[in-house]
Every structure is written in structure tokens, then in C-alpha cells.
Amino acid sequence: MKTFVAKPETVKRDWYVVDAEGKTLGRLATEIARRLRGKHKPEYTPHVDTGDYIVVINAEKVAVTGNKAQGKMYYSHTGFPGGIKSISFEKLIAKKPEMVIQKAVKGMLPRGPLGRAMFRKLKVYAGTEHNHIAQQPKQLDI
């Protein structure tokens, strides 16, 4: 018996829609990252993108525990000396709610070309409307 290795052209990808309203950010992000990688499938192969497409709605209503709303900081650097920027969770969720989920999931995916391909299958929307109805996404309860 030989070990099964998935081929990129034979991978069947499904579309799922996830409602983030009231869900804890970290618990939601780990399950999304797991499904983007394809680790929930029996034909998972580490060097092949076997994951599904995930559409996240209501990103603006995601929850964090404790006092992370004020205390959790997101940092970025401009590349210039002294160019470090920081923004708190509550300011980022008010300004760009999609970025909160995207940053959490991206940090859980592999670095490199394969991780970037997996990340492109994540679609995040602040409200309840999304434009992927033609793909007939299934509801995913997390």
C-alpha cells in the first residue's frame, strides 16, 4: 500500500460562510486557519493547498475576552527610523473590522508562497452582505 499524496489539480474545494457575531477572535481564527489549510480533510497533504474557501461575515461584531479591547495592540513599521505605529483593538475594529480577523488568521498560516495562496481563499466582510452567493457557500458553525 502506498501513501496517498494529493495533487493540486484533483483537490475539491468547497465554499463556507462563517458568521463571526459574538464569536471569540482566537477560537474563530484557529478554526478558519485549519480549514484554509485543509487539515480537516483526510486527503490533507502538507505541501499542497487542499483547503476550502471561507467567507466571514459580521467581522465588526467579533468578541475578545478580558480587557483586550483596550489593551491589545497591533504594531506595524514604516521602514523609516522611529517609524513604528501602533493601534488598539477597539480603534482598529472601528476603522477596519476586516483587518482584525485577517491579521489573526494570517499569523496562523505558513509563511511563503503556499501560505499566501491559502490566505487568498479567505474573504472577510464587516457586515452581513457578501458577493459570493453564486458560489453557493454552506453555513459553517464554529
UniProtKB/Swiss-Prot annotation:
Q: Does the keyword Ribonucleoprotein apply?
A: yes
Under the cellular component aspect of Gene Ontology, which terms does the record hold?
A: cytosolic large ribosomal subunit
GO MF terms, alphabetically ordered: mRNA binding; structural constituent of ribosome
Q: What is an annotated GO biological process for this record, any one? A: translation
In its keyword annotation, does this UniProt entry include Electron transport?
no
Keywords noted in UniProt: Ribonucleoprotein, Ribosomal protein
| InterPro entries in UniProt | Ribosomal_uL13 (IPR005822), Ribosomal_uL13_bac-type (IPR005823), Ribosomal_uL13_CS (IPR023563), Ribosomal_uL13_sf (IPR036899)
Q: Which PROSITE patterns does this chain map to?
A: RIBOSOMAL_L13 (PS00783)
Its family? Belongs to the universal ribosomal protein uL13 family.
Show the HAMAP family listed in the entry: Ribosomal_uL13 (MF_01366)
Q: How does it assemble?
A: Part of the 50S ribosomal subunit.
Job of this protein: This protein is one of the early assembly proteins of the 50S ribosomal subunit, although it is not seen to bind rRNA by itself. It is important during the early stages of 50S assembly.
Query: What is the protein's name according to its record?
Result: Large ribosomal subunit protein uL13
* Species of origin: Idiomarina loihiensis (strain ATCC BAA-735 / DSM 15497 / L2-TR)
